[in-house]
Amino acid sequence: MTVRLSSEHPRGRSAARRLRTRAAAYLAALGRADAEISILLVGDRRIRALNREWRGKDAATDVLSFPLSEPPGSGPLLGDVVISLDTAARRARQERRAVGAELDRYLAHGLLHLLGYDHERPADARRMARKEAELARAEGLVGAALREGGPARAAETETSWTRSPTSTSTRSPSGSTARGTRARSSRAGSGR
């Protein structure tokens, strides 16, 4: 398993170790110990530009995913996950949750997009939310949410992880993949 992590954000270094460890645990729990992914930590300005370019949405978002294989998740090179640290910090404050727990949620959501999960239809959204909740329970995030924000936060951690639809494109946002080459995917730009 290879998890490459880079940051364009001044606070990215503090989140890097946690996300690298969490990504490895999630991939193992998903039966994808063979996988290669890259994670890019950015601010709201950068993720807004990527969201506008790849999904036609001129707004900052929390996480974007760029699968590299067709169908998604079919090869060892899964793709890129881009996370906004600014959005994570803002939402964590709003929800009275630790920033690390918010980042864990975004990472799980992004990885599932790389594996072909989506939330285009209600049934797909429920399936994806169940898988996110399984990952949260497997990694003890529900317990962490109880410690960080009480029972309401734990319930939310388990159930409310779906957002907006996927779009398509032909390359990754950073021009790189888990191996550092330009991505070629017809399903780039999955986000919340």
Curated annotation (Swiss-Prot):
Disulfide bonds: none annotated. Residues 159-180 have a biased composition (Low complexity). Its cofactor is Zn(2+). PANTHER family: ENDORIBONUCLEASE YBEY, CHLOROPLASTIC (PTHR46986:SF1). GO terms for cellular component: cytoplasm. Its EC number is 3.1.-.-. It is found in: Cytoplasm. Its main location: cytoplasm. HAMAP family: Endoribonucl_YbeY (MF_00009). The keyword Metal-binding applies. Pfam families: YbeY (PF02130). The gene is ybeY. The keyword Cytoplasm applies. Zn(2+) binds at H109, H113, H119. Binds 1 zinc ion. One of its GO terms (biological process) is rRNA processing. Single strand-specific metallo-endoribonuclease involved in late-stage 70S ribosome quality control and in maturation of the 3' terminus of the 16S rRNA. Keywords: Cytoplasm, Endonuclease, Hydrolase, Metal-binding, Nuclease, Ribosome biogenesis, rRNA processing, Zinc. Residues 142-192 are annotated as: Disordered. GO terms for molecular function: metalloendopeptidase activity; RNA endonuclease activity; zinc ion binding. This is Endoribonuclease YbeY. It comes from the Bacteria. Belongs to the endoribonuclease YbeY family.
